[in-house]
Amino acid sequence: EHQIFTRRADFPNLKNYIGKSLVVTDGLTLLGGDDKAGICEIMEALAYLVAHPEIKHGKIMCAFGPDEEIGTGADHFDVKQFPVDYAYTIDGESLGQLEYETFNAAGGTVTLKGVSVHTGTAKGIMINCAKLAMQFDALLPGAAVPEHTCGRQGFFMLMSMETQVDTGKMNYIIRDHDKELFEAKKAFFLQAGQTLNDIYGREVCEVSVKDQYYNMYDVIKDNMECVNVAKAAMEKAGITPLCDPIRGGTDGSKISFMGIPTPNIFTGVENL
């Protein structure tokens, strides 16, 4: 109907599902199975346990939180109301994924301050914020962007930009798995602002950085029981655990630093 196709050339993982039934969306929304699949799986698991009391288990607690996709899902999570030894977010992707390494993450804001005058008398006076934005972005390493990095390589990403001649604002995200490299990237970002100010001999930009979440591995590495239990459960079900670092984060990143080690488990979705 909408001529939207998921092609194997673009998503090679599709070959793993030949002959299997797929649940798909219409392709018109930002999110597909993320994280509708996780909610369904949690509720189905609870329903199954209720229907089969012969299955012995300890105390199980579940929580559902909004706003994970904008990085604030765990901001008001009350760990006192969730007395567990460890937890799992059900927010992963393909079969077998078990993730306990995330990015360290920060947001960067650049406020631009230009000078607007009539174009006829602009020589030596006008400072165009659109040009400032391009200059600032050019000061960041061109290869350290999402489209040129993979694995544990971090990046800067310009998320949005709005400029007029005399005002402007740029919003970035800054990511790295390694804490030292993360701190170095934040310092580099702030220095880029100072460099631009030095070029113009005046304050043409104001730069700020705010941490968003940290690599859960720094907590989980000393609490590996949650990972080992999940691995054993998958292997018992004939599933091979796939433990790769997440090039992103989950609510489990923040919850882990609140005192509850919380790795992430697959939901079975592809092309979120």
Regions found by a protein language model. Give the residues of each.
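C-terminal helix-coil-helix/basic helical segment that borders enzyme active sites and/or dimer interfaces
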Residues: C205-V209, G238-P245
